[in-house]
């Protein structure tokens, strides 16, 4: 059975090299230690386009990349603080009398607490 997989893999390698040879696309090597096709579909993605843009020169691409990185860092920081914030809100909600609570706020606090616990469980499962 194992030899069938080896034969199948060899056939796929031969077939893919023949298809690549027939396609006629010229591959260009960039300084990223990988070879990419000039018309690759991945180039249409915004992050890849910003990284390898040949048409846009100057600070426009850098500004967009910095905005994305700032937003990503803000989101990550918020996710890291979410469990602590939920715990503080949970403690505060216990100290307030039930008659003084607004039902909507109590529900939001409870949802945040459960979301924080779910995040912690996911992180511990990944480890």
UniProtKB/Swiss-Prot annotation:
A motif (RxLR-dEER) lies at residues 48-65. Residues 1-21 form the signal peptide. It comes from the Eukaryota. The keyword Heme does not apply. Keywords: Host cytoplasm, Host nucleus, Secreted, Signal, Virulence. It is found in: Secreted; Host nucleus; Host cytoplasm. The keyword Secreted applies. Its main location: secreted. One of its GO terms (cellular component) is host cell nucleus. The RxLR-dEER motif acts to carry the protein into the host cell cytoplasm through binding to cell surface phosphatidylinositol-3-phosphate. Secreted effector that completely suppresses the host cell death induced by cell death-inducing proteins. Belongs to the RxLR effector family. This is Secreted RxLR effector protein 7. It comes from Plasmopara viticola. The lineage of its organism: Eukaryota, Sar, Stramenopiles, Oomycota, Peronosporales. The gene is RXLR7.
């Amino acid at each position: 059975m194992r030899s069938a997989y080896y034969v199948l893999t060899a056939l796929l390698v031969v077939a893919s090299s023949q298809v690549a040879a027939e396609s006629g696309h010229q591959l260009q090597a960039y300084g990223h230690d990988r070879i990419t096709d000039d018309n690759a579909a991945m180039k249409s993605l915004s992050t890849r386009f910003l990284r390898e843009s040949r048409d846009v020169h100057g600070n426009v691409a850098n500004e967009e990349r910095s905005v994305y990185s700032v937003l990503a860092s803000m989101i990550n920081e918020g996710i890291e603080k979410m469990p602590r914030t939920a715990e503080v809100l949970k403690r505060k909600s216990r100290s307030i009398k039930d008659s003084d609570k607004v039902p909507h706020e109590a529900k939001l606090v409870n949802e945040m607490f459960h979301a924080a616990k779910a995040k912690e469980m996911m992180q511990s499962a990944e480890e």
